[in-house]
């Protein structure tokens, strides 16, 4: 019975993807162990290569035991197992969020290396209920309260085939098949708000959980039928994103959309232009929306971006501030720099690296730069934007700025494209 429900879910979620490979994120907990066994049956039935990925966060003593256990199960099922390690660097600030991001970075990067397009995770019905309660406490809007069974991360599709299966059914499945699992001690700690909500839900009547699920479904329907199409229309009509890594928002067209969608549009642009993975909080975006309604020009900074109103348009471009992007050595044919730009070399170029333009560099080569196209496109903000673009150097010398076709030698040839690592539950930028 459980497998039939799982099979129906995964077939509906994947659709006509035509997969030959798939990966499953598996820890030692009951949810993901059940996912592994169910996914194995499905993969065998559909002649699909299943890879198993575990991430050790190096936070609990038994985590290595769990990874070893999953490796043994994978071996017994003739499935490849990959063990990854998250380095928390002894920084325990906002650890849950950082560990989650680190985990997904590691897993999706491995998927890209293995040419795997879909990653299965073990989020089940109880997780969705807890998430709804957490977001309700934070006064989230329609987008925040909604849930999704398909997400994107690092251009990998994240699929949750257990979304309508309660944890109790997964545990029952494991017990009936005499399959062992590990309990995470941190799940019983009052240190985390999620655990407190979980305990309250466990003590409540069944109708409370059923009512939350019903509310969630209503919100999801409203999002799918009204707000998601509106968001897509808003992006298509009001947003222009340029290869230089900046964007313009047409405020006249922007004005006709709902406030819920306006918040998402601003966040969409902030994530893409900043190269960050997380959206800005609503309380940070709200002042920008208020400024827009005042119909006066302004210049603010938020979320690693400069937001500059110029008449009826909003220009958004990268702001480095105190945190400059890391330099990247061009060892391979291409690299991603600042989580936004892909730089490709078309010839052997030893000892070169990608970095940002310094003021000293700019002074030395200023007279050789043709900034007219950038000046025209950016409403004369070229002098700021030029410092946000990738440049290629050998030692201390700038040899290329591909965006503006600057090369100090005819032998150099580099390509650059704007390729932000955009993460969203509602839209996918690829």
From Swiss-Prot:
Keywords of the record: ATP-binding, Cytoplasm, Ligase, Nucleotide-binding, tRNA processing
GO cellular component: cytoplasm
NCBIfam families according to UniProt: lysidine_TilS_N
Top-level division of the source organism's lineage: Bacteria
Source species of the chain: Rickettsia felis (strain ATCC VR-1525 / URRWXCal2)
Binding site for ATP: 27-32
One of the GO BP terms on file: tRNA modification
Entry note about domains: The N-terminal region contains the highly conserved SGGXDS motif, predicted to be a P-loop motif involved in ATP binding.
A single MF term (Gene Ontology): ATP binding
Enzyme Commission number(s) of this protein: 6.3.4.19
EC class (word): ligase
Organism lineage: Bacteria, Pseudomonadati, Pseudomonadota, Alphaproteobacteria, Rickettsiales
Name used for this protein in its record: tRNA(Ile)-lysidine synthase
Keyword ATP-binding included in the entry's annotation: yes
Catalytic activity: cytidine(34) in tRNA(Ile2) + L-lysine + ATP = lysidine(34) in tRNA(Ile2) + AMP + diphosphate + H(+)
Compartments where located: Cytoplasm
Pfam families associated with the record: ATP_bind_3
Family statement drawn from the similarity comment of this UniProt entry: Belongs to the tRNA(Ile)-lysidine synthase family.
Keyword Cytoplasm among record annotations: yes
Function of the protein: Ligates lysine onto the cytidine present at position 34 of the AUA codon-specific tRNA(Ile) that contains the anticodon CAU, in an ATP-dependent manner. Cytidine is converted to lysidine, thus changing the amino acid specificity of the tRNA from methionine to isoleucine.
């Amino acid at each position: 019975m459980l497998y039939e429900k799982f099979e129906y879910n995964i077939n509906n979620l994947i659709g006509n993807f035509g997969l030959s490979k798939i990966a499953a994120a598996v820890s030692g907990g009951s949810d993901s162990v059940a996912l592994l066994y169910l996914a194995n049956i499905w993969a065998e039935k559909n002649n699909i290569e299943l890879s198993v990925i575990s991430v050790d966060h190096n936070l609990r003593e038994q985590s290595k035991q769990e990874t070893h256990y999953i490796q043994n199960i994978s071996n017994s099922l003739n499935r490849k197992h990959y063990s990854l390690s998250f380095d928390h660097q002894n920084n325990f600030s906002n650890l849950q969020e950082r560990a989650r991001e680190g985990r997904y970075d590691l897993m999706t990067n491995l998927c890209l290396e293995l040419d795997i397009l879909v990653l299965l995770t073990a989020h089940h019905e109880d997780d969705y209920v807890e998430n709804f309660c957490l977001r309700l406490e934070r006064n989230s809007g329609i987008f925040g309260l909604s849930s999704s069974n398909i997400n994107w991360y690092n251009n990998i599709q994240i699929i949750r085939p257990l979304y309508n299966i309660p944890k109790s059914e997964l545990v029952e499945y494991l017990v009936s098949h005499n399959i062992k699992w590990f309990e995470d001690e941190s799940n019983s700690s009052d240190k985390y708000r999620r655990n407190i909500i979980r305990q309250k839900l466990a003590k409540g009547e069944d109708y409370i959980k059923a009512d939350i699920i019903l509310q969630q479904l209503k919100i999801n329907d409203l999002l799918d039928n009204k707000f998601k199409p509106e968001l897509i229309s808003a992006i298509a009509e009001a947003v222009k994103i340029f290869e230089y890594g900046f964007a313009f928002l047409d405020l006249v067209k922007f004005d006709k959309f709902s406030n819920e969608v306006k918040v998402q549009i601003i966040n969409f642009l902030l994530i893409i232009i900043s190269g960050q993975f997380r959206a800005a909080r609503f309380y940070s975006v709200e002042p920008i929306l208020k400024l827009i309604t005042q119909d006066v020009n302004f210049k603010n900074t938020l979320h690693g971006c400069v937001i500059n109103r110029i008449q009826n348009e909003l220009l958004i471009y990268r702001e480095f501030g105190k945190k400059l992007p890391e330099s990247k050595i061009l060892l391979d044919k291409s690299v991603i720099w600042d989580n936004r730009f892909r730089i490709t070399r078309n010839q052997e170029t030893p000892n070169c690296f990608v970095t940002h333009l310094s003021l000293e560099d700019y002074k030395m080569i200023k007279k050789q730069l043709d900034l007219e196209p950038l000046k025209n496109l950016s409403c004369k903000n070229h002098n700021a934007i030029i410092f946000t673009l990738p440049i290629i150097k050998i030692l201390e010398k700038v040899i290329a700025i591909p965006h503006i076709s600057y090369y100090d030698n005819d032998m150099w040839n580099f390509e650059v494209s704007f390729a932000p690592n955009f993460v969203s539950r509602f839209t996918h930028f690829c």
